Amino acid sequence: METQVVIMSGPKAISTGIAGLTDPGPGDLVVDIAYSGISTGTEKLFWLGTMPPFPGMGYPLVPGYESFGEVVQAAPDTGFRPGDHVFIPGANCFTGGLRGLFGGASKRLVTAASRVCRLDPAIGPEGALLALAATARHALAGFDNALPDLIVGHGTLGRLLARLTLAAGGKPPMVWETNPARRTGAVGYEVLDPEADPRRDYKAIYDASGAPGLIDQLVGRLGKGGELVLCGFYTVPVSFAFVPAFMKEMRLRIAAEWQPADLSATRALIESGALSLDGLITHRRPAAEAAEAYQTAFEDPDCLKMILDWKDAK
């Protein structure tokens, strides 16, 4: 079995090609992908060639871990059947030396049924946003976690953090954004240039920007005993001046990727109408134009989220 895929053969080297797929086994699904998202976090680091080394990485690889599509084949005991629509957080199902480190940017995928999440087909392209929304939910969830009163960055993750804060019954957070073009689209909360915000007593600051060198600035905006949550991915060592953090008795927390419970909880919020994914997808390109799509996603500041459309791919 073969399928069309996006291949990242090195930094800034994106193409489409044909890849072999592993045979489905017991407990597996075969899914035809309709839409896949491009991550401006980890995928961008691979595209730039700046991803810190970790096990399993290397080129050539099939990128993408945000895919939505239709089940076309299901093993008997999976609980799924052809026609079901699911979110897939990537797959490692390729032959011929292609790394499936993420593996979601493909017309067809073979994956364990335990890894997917069933979705209403009416969700459309927004179905590819489930993992990103679940990542935002993961940062907020937990018995002792304070909801943010300041979010740094009004990209897709920052917007989801703000929407989830409101959905959880929290007070409208302040959001900082240095790019004027990204200060639009807020519903129920305010977006400001950091220089226009005089406040210095925030209780919980969530950094969704991933920008280096911000911690000292953010510590100065915390109140006594405040918490700083790092939601981005940082390629350089994270450091900060100790004395200001000591005086503030700052608490530091790092939020990593979603867990299965986050996917289920986020799906429930979407299905109930408590969380909207509207307005997050700003760009959409056919999968055949992947090279241009990746460049736009990573270099155009007006691009919040790029979606690849696989419906016409062979």
UniProtKB/Swiss-Prot annotation:
This protein catalyzes the penultimate step in bacteriochlorophyll a biosynthesis. This is 2-desacetyl-2-hydroxyethyl bacteriochlorophyllide A dehydrogenase. It is an enzyme of class 1 (oxidoreductase). GO terms for biological process: light-independent bacteriochlorophyll biosynthetic process; photosynthesis. Pathway: Porphyrin-containing compound metabolism; bacteriochlorophyll biosynthesis (light-independent). The gene is bchC. CDD domains: 2-desacetyl-2-hydroxyethyl_bacteriochlorophyllide_like (cd08255). GO terms for molecular function: bacteriochlorophyllide-a dehydrogenase activity. Gene3D superfamilies: Medium-chain alcohol dehydrogenases, catalytic domain, NAD(P)-binding Rossmann-like Domain. Its EC number is 1.-.-.-. It holds the Pfam family ADH_N. NCBIfam families: bchC (TIGR01202). Keywords: Bacteriochlorophyll biosynthesis, Chlorophyll biosynthesis, Oxidoreductase, Photosynthesis.
